[in-house]
Every structure is written in C-alpha cells, then in structure tokens.
Amino acid sequence: MTESGPLENMLAQMEQAREYVDIDDGIYERLKSPERTLSVSLPVRMDDGSVEVFDAYRCQFDSARGPYKGGIRYHPTVSEEEVSALAGWMTWKTALVDLPFGGAKGGIVCNPKELSDNEIEQLTRRYTEGIRRMIGPETDIPAPDMNTDPRTMAWVMDTYSVYQGYAVPEVVTGKPPEIGGTDGRVEATGRGVSIITEETFEYFDTDIQDADVAIQGFGNVGSVTADLLSERGANIVAVSDVTGAIHDPTGLDIADVQAYADANGGRLEGYDAEPISNDDLLTLDVDALIPAAIEDVITVDVAERLAADVIVEAANGPTTFDAAQVLSDRGVPVVPDILANAGGVIVSYLEWVQNSQQYSWDVEEVNRDLRQRLTGAFDEMLVAYEDRNIPTLRTAAYTIALERSADAHEFRGLFP
C-alpha cells in the first residue's frame, strides 16, 4: 500500500478540521496553496577545485498573520513538495501558539556529512545570495532546521548583512548569542517537547515518575527532550539514531548516553545496552512514544503494531495521514507536531523581538515565556477538543490554527 506524501498529509489534515470551522470557501482555497516557492541552483566550488551544483528551495506559504517564519534544512531528501508541506505546518504552528508570523521553509538537497566545513559555508552563503531578495527581518526570517545550526545561521546573517551594508541580526533566528542569538534557543524545541509531554501525562493521569518513554532520534531535539524528562523522573527506556536504537527496560542513563554520543560523532552504535531496530523502538510498550527524527516514520504498518499509550510528535509530520486514522480508530491519542515541537519557533520569536528592541533577556525569562505560551496553547487545544466534541487532538489543534489564519485573511481582505 502506497501512503500519501507530506503535502497530501498536510492538506488532508486541513480537510478534517474544516468540518469544525466556518471558513469562507475562497479563503480556504487560498490557505491550501503556498503564496510562492523559489527554486534555485547553487554552483559551489568544492575543496578539490571542482564545481558542484546543488538544488535548493524556499517556500513562503502564508503571510496573513505576519512575516514568514521557518527553518532551513540540509538533507538528501529535500524536495519542493517537502518544503511546501513543512511551510504549511509552520503556518498552522505559528497560528496555534498565536505568534505574529506566517509560515515558510527552505532546504538544500545535499548530504552535509559528505561536505567539509568550508564547503558547507560556501553552500550556505550561495544559498543566502539566492534567496536574499525573499528574506528580511520584516518579510521572511529563517532559522535552523535539520542539519543546520547556530553557525549556519551566522553565515546567513553575515551574507545578508554584507549586501545591506550593515549588521542585520534580526534577519535570522537561532544565531550564536555572541551575534544576537538568545540563550535557550538551541534547547527550545526539546524543552518544549518535554513541557508538552508533562502536560500530556497530567491530562491522562499518568505519573511522570513511573512513566516509560521511548524517543526515536537523539539529535538536538531528542537528546534535550530525553535529558529534561529524565530530570523530571521519567524512565527513558530507548533512544535511537540513524544506525539503530538502544534499549534498557530499567531506564537509560541519559547523561552517560549523551557523553558516549559526543565521543563517537553523535552515534549510539556500540553503547552498552540492548541494540534494537528503529522499528522495534516504535512498537515498544511504553507510556509515551516521542518520534523526534524525520517525517512519515509511523506508517499504517507501525500504527497497527504500536503499543504506546500516547504519541507526542517532536518531529514534523512523523505520522502519515493513513496511520493517524488507524491510531484514532484504536483510541491512541496523538499530540500533534504543530504544538509539540513549537518551542523552537516560540523562542525564535523571542529572539527576533529582542533583536528588534536591541534589548536582551536572561534565559530564565525566555524559558518562563516559552512554558506559558505552550501550556496556554495546550489548554486551548483541550478546550476545542472537549467542547466541540472533536475526535482527535490534531484536528482540535488545526481548528484553532485555521480559524486564526482565516480571520486574518478576512480582516485584511483581497487586493486588488
């Protein structure tokens, strides 16, 4: 059985929510398609003197609520369809947590593990030059995503600033603190996932001190989530990377796992725990499964065998639409990605505000604001879920996001 791709999944999720909201047909049609997508070819001189050309994209999905906001990812599977879906999800995410942003996403088709630091820098600067007429502190503000980091954002900011003739730190978020980044941004997505997981346990009357948690992915998001949940008393029984997963039913020592990964290039292979496959991890009998890797890992086949009590989506689009239907039929709650991983864009917003005001906040204030916004959005989702008798948490979240986006279009009208 061939399952739908990320863009089809996103549109199907919208369609499910439409039944519960009153949206003008014309506005709904506008919300289904990106406002614009740029495709660029990036010639880069490699370290050996050869020239390689990379395909890249920037999709701007919707700007009714404010400037476009969304990350830049480097991965071999990047495609126009993928960035369009991710830009759409970012639109609903910013609306759900009530940030004054729209949604965007960019990406370069490449394998950064096969590139030197110099080649990645040249590729980043070439990409920035290619999209610089689209981005800006009041138009489109990029951020890190898969395989990009604060250093990458520093190169984007510097390249854009050179063209402007002065420093423009607010053109990107997720920068190093030394050039205008905010403390707490690197950990923000994982911290947000841990906050939402705590709220989810409380809602379903699960004691976090007795909770078993499996996390697919041990990159920036998965590792921070594991560390923070472990600090709160949760039992992290499995984590994974691209080589496979490690499992200990008595609970992994997350600090030790992190130290091992740091010493082995981020790899978990060889760690002193039971090696299992990523598929095995996804079907463990746990209180919470947290997919924190890539899209479409929970397929129909996985959903039929899944034994977790609840899923908290740390990755973007980890559950296919058809798999979500299976989980709904089985009564397995899924806390959607547009809420669970919104911590990153919330703190990106706080960084952008600080840059615009030229006034910095301490990390305690940033984390307080993050928690307040996430718990508020979680409560709003629950109110919609219960009061409107909506069948899933995802659809409840989408009703809020669609209503806010549609209201913005309604007030702004159509020009000309």
From Swiss-Prot:
SMART domains: ELFV_dehydrog. Its EC number is 1.4.1.-. Transmembrane segments: none annotated. GO terms for biological process: glutamate catabolic process. Disulfide bonds: none annotated. The active site is at K105. It is an enzyme of class 1 (oxidoreductase). One of its GO terms (molecular function) is glutamate dehydrogenase (NAD+) activity. SUPFAM superfamilies: Aminoacid dehydrogenase-like, N-terminal domain (SSF53223), NAD(P)-binding Rossmann-fold domains (SSF51735). It comes from the Archaea. Keywords: Oxidoreductase. Homohexamer. Strain NRC-36014 contains 4 distinct glutamate dehydrogenases while strain NRC-1 contains only 3. Belongs to the Glu/Leu/Phe/Val dehydrogenases family. This is Glutamate dehydrogenase A2. It comes from Halobacterium salinarum (strain ATCC 700922 / JCM 11081 / NRC-1) (Halobacterium halobium).
